[in-house]
Amino acid sequence: MAHKKGVGSSRNGRDSQPKMLGVKRADGQFVLAGSILVRQRGTRIHPGRNVGRGGDDTLFAKVDGVVSFERSGRDKKTVSVIPVEAAL
């Protein structure tokens, strides 16, 4: 017979690093060209006017301006940047 108790090991104890996803700039906020607006997986929010989409679906401002979130249809969200000249 064993004189020591067999010690099992838990099969838990792992987790992935946080990915810091989500909306980074609010509606009505002024942004500079190149600013990241949304970090996401897939196109949950679609790029609108003056907004580009990166290879990892990150949305970024192409011009200086004011952020505008819109809803088109029942379930499609878009984010646009209204240029500074037009916003004044």
Curated annotation (Swiss-Prot):
Gene3D superfamilies: 2.40.50.100
Keywords: Ribonucleoprotein, Ribosomal protein
Keyword Ribonucleoprotein: yes
Domain of life: Bacteria
Pfam families attached to this UniProt entry: Ribosomal_L27 (PF01016)
Stored SUPFAM superfamilies: Ribosomal L27 protein-like
HAMAP family listed in its UniProt record: Ribosomal_bL27
Official protein name in the record: Large ribosomal subunit protein bL27
Organism from which the protein derives: Pelotomaculum thermopropionicum (strain DSM 13744 / JCM 10971 / SI)
